[in-house]
Swiss-Prot record:
Residues 2-142 form the Globin domain. The keyword Electron transport does not apply. Heme b binds at H59, H88. It comes from the Eukaryota. It comes from Capra hircus. This is Hemoglobin subunit zeta.
Length: 142
């Protein structure tokens, strides 16, 4: 699956706004993930998962930074996220379905923060992009 030129433009345009609010977007995305998919909490037994905790904010920032790495390497997401894929597959052993759950939560968060920008076309482009990211993160599981 590859992105069209229009989809890339949409992703890059919205990313310029997301990147200025990375900590807020990341924290809210994780809070949404743990609320909607509480089984994901099992991967964070050492974290304070209360709303707005320092650990949640820090990890949320890391998540959005990883998405940013993928955006910056939009034509080669595989190389940008290879080490992260290895970490999640071999060390953390995260169930791959959680990447889809996280992607969905990020889409909802983006829609709530950027309602004017998150058009149907933007939703479709970001959904496709995050599917690519999720696919890359699960490559090492095969």
């Amino acid at each position: 699956m590859s992105l069209t030129r229009t989809e890339r433009t949409i992703i890059l345009s919205l990313w310029s706004k997301i990147s200025t609010q990375a900590d807020v977007i990341g924290t809210e995305t994780l809070e949404r993930l743990f609320s909607c998919y509480p089984q994901a909490k099992t991967y964070f037994p050492h974290f304070d998962l209360h709303s707005g905790s320092a650990q949640l904010r820090a990890h949320g920032s890391k998540v959005v930074a990883a998405v940013g790495d993928a955006v910056k390497s939009i034509d080669n997401v595989t190389s940008a996220l290879s080490k992260l894929s290895e970490l999640h597959a071999y060390v953390l052993r995260v169930d791959p379905v959680n990447f889809k759950f996280l992607s969905h939560c990020l889409l909802v968060t983006l829609a709530s923060h950027f309602p004017a920008d998150f058009t149907a076309d933007a939703h479709a482009a970001w959904d496709k992009f995050l599917s690519i990211v999720s696919g890359v993160l699960t490559e090492k599981y095969r």
